[in-house]
């Protein structure tokens, strides 16, 4: 855990430099956030619409993604090419992302070009045309996106994992949908979805940077012209399984096996247990950091994979950052662990990770380890709030969760988590006996036989010896997966998301 210390010091310095970055201005509506930074040559826009894939009609998975990604493909005043050319001329950007609950439209422009930019941005939001030629192109792009997920073992494993975890629930399909549904999408489908979901009551929005009052007034006025109404989301909970289950995704000639292990949880950011779970997940395996237990046991001690991590909620990185992105708010969440060893070590890694997960429920983490992790997570706040754009994203996320103090009290909430409560929180929310395991493998039947067998292989890197780890390795090998043949399902990668 020593590698955390220097990083925490740098983070603390970053916080001191960060605090005066923006000031929060009063908006006429509680649904618009304004963060002013006079003198900054940039203006950021962010609109969050509760029109994500959870709102897809049952027979049309992927329609939310389809609709959102047509918004910037042509408006009343601009064709797709004209829009792209205009943005290029003024050095501005418009981005669209879609998750289960929300669509997020972002904009970035030089302050001196904000008038020209806003005339485009407002039309993307309020006046898309869903041109017929763009509908066909979008279908092709969306189908390519799904094929890309199948080709990428990491995204494939996560997609299968999420679909199964939330089977029968509104989260139970890829955000991008299925190939069969996409091929049937029409312009009218996109128009109706937009009409029914892009409503005032579904929208949260914000501005940051060199924001003038006149821009705020215009922005709010245009949002106020959106159709009134709000779509009430289903409150149905996902089904919770009480056994271990395995899905083997068969894909030829795999050098590694992508592993996902976890289960649905009954908390999200609105639950007081979120912060203890955030610490436990960081202790177990902070994303792309080397200090976590999984990283240490899988990579550092045994050299079985390049990384191993754990997440207390759905995780999507912010670009190339190690940090979680904004705009992936979810009512329903899940805990999961991941790694990617060579196939021969897949079973051993499953046992090792479940063993570490189990220890959190049976053994108290040392005070020193938690102190270091607590400092790391609390000080990470500096990078979560590093720019006006990131701050705007954090503020809108807390507004969506209806938690007005989440951002301001983030560090305090992390720092006040009692060490004595962590094991009981783990007992409440971590269930190693109830996990779903997804593995991308070359031969499903051979892997199934291995998982059901008595022996557990361990192939260390060339020249490495078990040494002092032999006794611990033997204990891990003896970990009982308690699997029956009916608990293991084999599927073909090429058949996923059809």
Question: Where would I find each of the regions flagged by the language model?
Answer:
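Short glycine/Trp-rich loop-beta-loop segment that forms part of the substrate-binding cleft
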Residues: 135
